[in-house]
Amino acid sequence: MGHYIKTEEHVTLFVEDIGHGRPIIFLHGWPLNHKMFEYQMNELPKRGFRFIGVDLRGYGQSDRPWEGYDYDTMADDVKAVIYTLQLENAILAGFSMGGAIAIRYMARHEGADVDKLILLSAAAPAFTKRPGYPYGMRKQDIDDMIELFKADRPKTLADLGKQFFEKKVSPELRQWFLNLMLEASSYGTIHSGIALRDEDLRKELAAIKVPTLILHGRKDRIAPFDFAKELKRGIKQSELVPFANSGHGAFYEEKEKINSLIAQFSNS
């Protein structure tokens, strides 16, 4: 079933809620929505889990305010979802930008009602290069991408989508993926890009006190595998599982293995 959850005045998020059992909250990446987790949504309820897919503000079926795309506000939105649905002992799973927002939630809200964390191809601890952190894109690369969004968003997103998958996927799946990205608000996409460019979570990793599973493709061209190694180094109770032949789209390329790992970790 679907919920519309008010997180602040004039902002309501859409949340897909399927199945019964221990809740796993999925936070999507940039600029996607909860439907990207279709292959987890189809499987995890059969294994006794409650799938909760959040459309972050500006994405999917959620409201599209002009502002509030910083990680603090996004994390507060997640807190409102957890509170409204009265979730306890939840597993929080974030993909790419969603992984970064999950980390901010754990630090900002002290991991309230979350017992375990899953970081899937996370765009964290920082998405762009900075002193002491030579990984990821340059900030100028994000600025250039934003200008391309303003000029021709569909083509720019299509080009971005080509970098997601390391293995060959069908043209139809690529088109489906592009359609998900085009559902996002244009200004929300840009504002989230600014957050990805500027946010730095390195000092917040020590605040994560729960068991954490890090799943990351070694051939990720969007969130390099070095990100995963930095997360492993900074989060005490963490386990890193690399996917040797997958890119950023490991959630699809390795869906059977990832679903099994999520279920095993969530049941442990």
Swiss-Prot record:
Enzyme kind, highest EC tier: hydrolase
Sequence ranges assigned to domain AB hydrolase-1 in this UniProt record: 23-254
Coiled-coil region(s): none
Catalytic machinery residues: 96, 220, 248
Keyword Transmembrane helix: no
EC number: 3.-.-.-
Keyword terms of this UniProt record: Hydrolase
GO molecular function: hydrolase activity
This protein's GO CC annotations: membrane
Assigned protein family: Belongs to the AB hydrolase superfamily.
Protein name: AB hydrolase superfamily protein YisY
Organism in which the protein naturally occurs: Bacillus subtilis (strain 168)
Organism classification: Bacteria, Bacillati, Bacillota, Bacilli, Bacillales
